[in-house]
């Protein structure tokens, strides 16, 4: 039987991730293509010390990504300070991600186990 606290925590985390993705839209606008949760939260085998792994796919050049990445990291830090939930974001160009998807095991795992938030 699943404890109520586990269910309550799952929905709390879901809401925090959704809010994070909405704030990413504010930063990136239409250049944001996907927000994917992967790792233990996507698989459902997380524990109280797990971070939330998030792949952020964008239609931006590497230089454009460098210009906004500190904003994204600051946003993740602010969420951790407010909620105690540690979000670990990675920002990648969507075309590069798609290009390397069949070659890099890391990208394959994200594709296979990831949960698209937006």
Question: Where are each of the predicted segments found?
Answer:
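Catalytic core of pol beta-like nucleotidyltransferases
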Residues: 1-31, 43-48, 59-118
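Short gly/ser-rich loop at a beta-strand->alpha-helix junction or flexible surface loop bordering the NTP-binding
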Residues: 33-41
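Alpha-helical architecture
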Residues: 37, 49-51
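Short beta-strand->loop micro-motif that forms the acidic, two-metal-ion catalytic signature
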Residues: 53-57
């Amino acid at each position: 039987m699943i404890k109520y606290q586990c269910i309550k925590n799952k929905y709390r985390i879901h809401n925090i991730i959704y809010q994070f993705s909405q704030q990413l839209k504010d930063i990136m606008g239409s250049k944001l293509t996907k927000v994917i949760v992967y790792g233990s939260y996507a698989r459902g085998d997380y524990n109280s010390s797990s971070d939330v792994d998030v792949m952020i796919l964008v239609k931006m050049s590497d230089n454009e990504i460098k210009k906004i990445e500190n904003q994204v990291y600051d946003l993740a830090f602010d969420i951790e300070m407010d909620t105690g939930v540690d979000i670990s974001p990675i920002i990648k160009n969507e075309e590069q991600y798609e290009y390397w998807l069949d070659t890099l095991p890391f990208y394959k795992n994200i594709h296979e186990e990831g949960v698209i938030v937006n």
